[in-house]
Amino acid sequence: MIEQQQFGQSRICYDSEWVSSPELALFDPQYWQAQNKVVGSATGRGTTWFVQLPKITAALRHYRRGGLFGKLVKDHYWFRSWSATRSFAEFHLLKQLREAGVNVPRPIAAYAMRKGLFYQADLLSERIANAQDLVTILQKHSLNAELYQKIGVEIAKMHRVGVNHTDLNIHNILIDAQETIWIIDFDKCYPQAGDGWKQENLDRLKRSFNKERVKRSIHWHDKDFQALLTGYESQQ
């Protein structure tokens, strides 16, 4: 069950299946370190901490800005409403996608703290076990056509729900040990009507393959993307 709890100028939205006692400390890495519950980390735009909850392993991420503006205002965003905060929006989008059968991480808890006209935010979501992103995999070996078709199918499922993944790239697509395809990182993504943006998602993904082929010499060829499109189009 999805519930919310207010703590002064802070609010938590959480799934009571995974969080029985909502508290602000859940979003503090030092809290997890003190309990020896940090089981790993990943560095990108800031550090994502992997923490062990009683029934699930979670990824704890603090929202940070990128680009030039992010160097000036690192983690503050304009406050409009609680539901419009980046953490709450991503939480509910993940919930919508999971309910529609799309393979995305479970949303566990979202946090936002209002500071005057601005806010800061964090998200706890499921860590996908035994999974690697496409960049990591393709640096080691190529993928067969069947896996590319499965990637296309998963993207099509997301599009059928009407969700625009504005940063669809090969860092945000995972394959786990059972060869299940997962799509992650829905910050700034949103529901959208129409169809034109769907091709833009696919074009962005293809540019990502080409970029990493030059940058990291990944094992990828243009024909692989055609296999992905075959899977995608099978769902239309």
From Swiss-Prot:
Its EC number is 2.7.1.166. One of its GO terms (molecular function) is phosphotransferase activity, alcohol group as acceptor. It is a peripheral membrane protein. It is found in: Cell inner membrane. It is an enzyme of class 2 (transferase). Keywords: ATP-binding, Cell inner membrane, Cell membrane, Kinase, Lipopolysaccharide biosynthesis, Membrane, Nucleotide-binding, Transferase. One of its GO terms (biological process) is lipopolysaccharide core region biosynthetic process. It catalyses: an alpha-Kdo-(2->6)-lipid IVA + ATP = a 4-O-phospho-alpha-Kdo-(2->6)-lipid IVA + ADP + H(+). GO terms for cellular component: plasma membrane. The active site is at D167. Pathway: Bacterial outer membrane biogenesis; LPS core biosynthesis. Its main location: membrane. Gene3D superfamilies: Transferase(Phosphotransferase) domain 1. Belongs to the protein kinase superfamily. KdkA/RfaP family. Catalyzes the ATP-dependent phosphorylation of the 3-deoxy-D-manno-octulosonic acid (Kdo) residue in Kdo-lipid IV(A) at the 4-OH position. HAMAP family: KDO_kinase. This is 3-deoxy-D-manno-octulosonic acid kinase. It comes from Vibrio vulnificus (strain YJ016).
